[in-house]
């Protein structure tokens, strides 16, 4: 699309000085056949460096948007760079790489299985739900031959879907093609290692009824990103509800004229990034109603500013505490000339910086992810560890935390080792905290599986 030449290796090859994007270390590395190669020895080298370089030099302390635009980081890819030479035969990639779906054993006698680590697995689940299939989620990884199926893998048992037995094979084939996933058919429920397909610990997951709050005090940007993620990319319908509807007993749905809003109609409530108006919207009575709804089995997903608000200090909604960065009351801050304050404050901000994160991939919120993740950080809010908090995503160690972009040593020390993604059980329901934007501008997509899991997997667990 942008006139950049991309090549693919026809053989295995080795680079003696390859810099690992994740750790920053330079090492000898062997790459397998099929590896994609983008050389900077081409006319679009400036564009390539802008979107592919691990880090860019930043001279100013004040930035408009974000401090890194590295595509390998944004999509959480395993990537390396080198300034040295290498030798390998290549072919030019002339067409966009498509996710071609397929079914292995299309007349399976027992079950069909979709590995949840596939990029488009959530789309497949949405399509299964649309056709009223009963689906289970694998509680832990299992192994068949030399293939690993990750935790969260979708299991469609033939015996649990007898009403669709006549059309199942054709519908499964169509879903594989439409979603662009590989589906494997099983003639038996037995596996080589791990829990068998019909094991009771593999959890039934049903299509949730999902509501997304929109309009002030919530960010229209974040709300739009979340809606786009589900409505367009995943194909899972969600209702947009005006935030003010929570303050009224009978108010129209977003885009509707007569239907009223009742939290009991929903299984999942998503709160986008919100600002100072949250305390006005969520007064004691509203908080009590939401707490009752969660206790009865609802899943509350609070993101960014809304996640910060639903902590003990701001709303007393849970026992989870927010670690706030201490206010600068130094003599220097108080005595700065007016024309120096913007630059001084800019150095204390985190303007969209890529940080290394550790992920608990055994938790349903992280199903399908790798154990390491690049999260995009704005601001300094972070959750403190708590016995009630199931920590799923935490910032890395101080010496490896900052991958790309700017963050002061004080900010990095403040964040290191603390939690940005976690889950709290409350009665029969759950509160999901996502301090960082998991799908920023639908560009920083590496963490987006957490949002999909929060909606599609968490309610079943």
Can you say where each PLM-predicted feature lies in the sequence?
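Intrinsic-disorder/low-complexity accessory segments
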Residues: 1-461
